[in-house]
């Protein structure tokens, strides 16, 4: 009985502390829905479609408001003006990164995703420099993507127009492009090592986008309980072992005067800084950076392609117009190239509309403020989590009339020319914008046009019965599983 009383008193104290902390914080933070002790607003949000819940809250509280995930407040930025004002006009102050417990367990503040301050700035600057040296934005990387697109066509022809799930093959394309940058070589799709690498990344995507992992990131204490996070950490460990072996191979054959790939550049950077006790370019940092480049360079691009094929099957009239433009501009005798894009406004508009419509990262990768800041009349304390709602920008009704409709006309003017939009932010904006945006744009254009140059997409059901709704709309929009037939043209 005495123990029970002690437990009740302890729980009551925890609730009281939680209430007092929330009450004090709310005096300065933007308004928002009333949060419950300990769990915050978690029970008031639709886990499968957080962006929809946020849109409803924005109608009540305005473009800047506060929600609590557990006991931690997150300031939501809703609409283009609020997002731009924070991430661009106050870019430095909003350039921090939230600690995501599941990532922090293995990253420990290292890499491109989880690092902060000067380490992040130096890592991002170094990564972009190396990627440019490796040919990003140049003909050399375009050649690699074209080669990979040709290999994909060969693999798709081997399906003999039979029903197939395209997810694994579509993941192989950007993954192999990244392999050529990181390791200097690509893999055959049936290579067992490559198959294992692809499986690990697909498993990590599947596991991370589960309800349990969202709960884990809100309540890290769950780490000590059974759950799928243990399986995810095993996948991470297997990936790190693979990368460690690749690094060891590179160390044995490293030529400081002739770097071959991303790993060589990182090893040379480490060697130059080995006498600098302040340097954070450690082996662990190298490993996590490689993982981050792989993940960012493969996951969202392949998922966008999966969504793209699904949407083109649902709208065969749009796919037919793209194929007409491909036939007129490129023909059948050569591979698509980036120079073609300026002559293919409809295809360009379709690819932009795919990215807008699928809303790949609805609430962006969470930011944090790097210092106390006055923003729109509110004091946001240093370290506060920031959720920029990209959904609210990509689905802005004034910029994109009928945003719920898949319509390439959103990116075409009255004359049928391609029309840019400042609201097109699938890669985010500001200092933490996706470092691989240029690479992703090239891959999407070259791979999708190459597929449609060689195949007609045949669904297994009536197009009107195709449902492109994501199976999960939490951190990432995950495409539903489906099969189709790639019929040679």
Swiss-Prot record:
According to its UniProt entry, the protein's GO biological process terms are: organic acid metabolic process; xenobiotic metabolic process
Per its record, what are the GO molecular function terms? Answer: heme binding; iron ion binding; oxidoreductase activity, acting on paired donors, with incorporation or reduction of molecular oxygen, reduced flavin or flavoprotein as one donor, and incorporation of one atom of oxygen
Q: Please report a single Pfam family linked to this protein.
A: p450
Q: What is its main location?
A: endoplasmic reticulum
> Could you say which enzyme class this protein belongs to?
oxidoreductase
Localization recorded for this chain is: Endoplasmic reticulum membrane; Microsome membrane
Record-annotated residues binding heme? 434
Sorted UniProt keywords: Endoplasmic reticulum, Heme, Iron, Membrane, Metal-binding, Microsome, Monooxygenase, Oxidoreductase
Please give the cofactor(s) recorded in the UniProt entry for this protein. heme
How does the record classify its membrane topology? Peripheral membrane protein
Flavoprotein in keyword set = no
Q: What family, per the record? A: Belongs to the cytochrome P450 family.
Q: What is this protein called?
A: Cytochrome P450 2C30
